[in-house]
């Protein structure tokens, strides 16, 4: 993982003669040498916690080229990840929205990227909004271990229930008739996880899976919870 983190800057952007690819989201700045001139990009984002990404483009001169922004599977289909293993429990028609200089624009999808082609000028602002509500995920029947269970995700993050938050044995937790529309996103106010976004349900609290096992000795946790 430490090696991957150091390599991330090299994975965020790619380009061809007349096309810039934005493959990952996060605060960053880079300069791309396109065939017709250099373009500086500055990206600001709280992804993966927030759904909005902003990119300011600074071409050396007015320049026509394509900007391709990756739209993750979880934001563009009715499954959490590619492969068909983990479909969402409820389908949605929400799609990614892209604005240029505060006006919504049309885009075409090409191999997972939303592509905009236009003549760009200095200080053009691109805003990408990804649908990032809490979603219930199921497994396909072949994953027998997860039969009769569901999990919650939000954006690219998988969530889990820890016993320290729920005050009962993890084995006793059930989702029952909980609907994803009942999920409330709150920010943890204190402790080592201060600022982390939590999913609050009527009877269950969930934290991002990567934060598991950071609060005391009680390490009981579940991603897949009984329906």
Regions found by a protein language model. Give the residues of each.
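Short acidic, flexible loop segments centered on an aromatic residue
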Residues: 70-74
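C-terminal beta-rich recognition modules with glycine/proline-rich loops and embedded aromatic residues
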Residues: 1-58, 76-100, 105-109, 113-121, ...
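Extended extracellular/luminal ectodomain segments enriched in beta-structured repeat modules
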Residues: 60-67
């Amino acid at each position: 993982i430490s090696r991957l983190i150091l390599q991330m800057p090299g994975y965020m952007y790619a380009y061809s003669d007349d096309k810039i690819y934005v493959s990952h989201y996060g605060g960053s700045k880079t300069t791309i040498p396109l065939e017709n001139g250099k373009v500086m990009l500055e990206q600001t984002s709280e992804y993966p916690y927030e759904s909005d990404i902003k990119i300011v483009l600074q071409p050396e001169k007015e320049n026509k080229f394509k900007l391709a922004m990756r739209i993750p599977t979880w934001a563009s289909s009715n499954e959490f990840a590619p492969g068909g293993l983990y479909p969402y429990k409820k389908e949605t028609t929400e799609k990614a929205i892209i604005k240029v200089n505060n006006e919504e624009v049309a885009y075409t999808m090409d191999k997972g990227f939303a592509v905009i082609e236009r003549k760009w000028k200095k200080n053009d602002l691109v805003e990408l909004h990804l649908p990032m509500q809490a979603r219930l995920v199921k497994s396909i029947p072949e994953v027998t271990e997860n039969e009769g269970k569901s999990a919650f995700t939000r954006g690219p993050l998988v969530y889990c229930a820890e016993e320290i938050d729920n005050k009962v044995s993890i084995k006793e937790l059930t989702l029952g008739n909980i609907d994803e529309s009942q999920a409330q996103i709150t920010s943890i106010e204190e402790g080592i996880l201060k600022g982390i976004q939590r999913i609050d349900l009527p009877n269950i609290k969930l934290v991002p899976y990567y934060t598991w096992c950071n609060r005391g000795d009680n390490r009981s946790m579940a991603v897949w919870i009984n329906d």
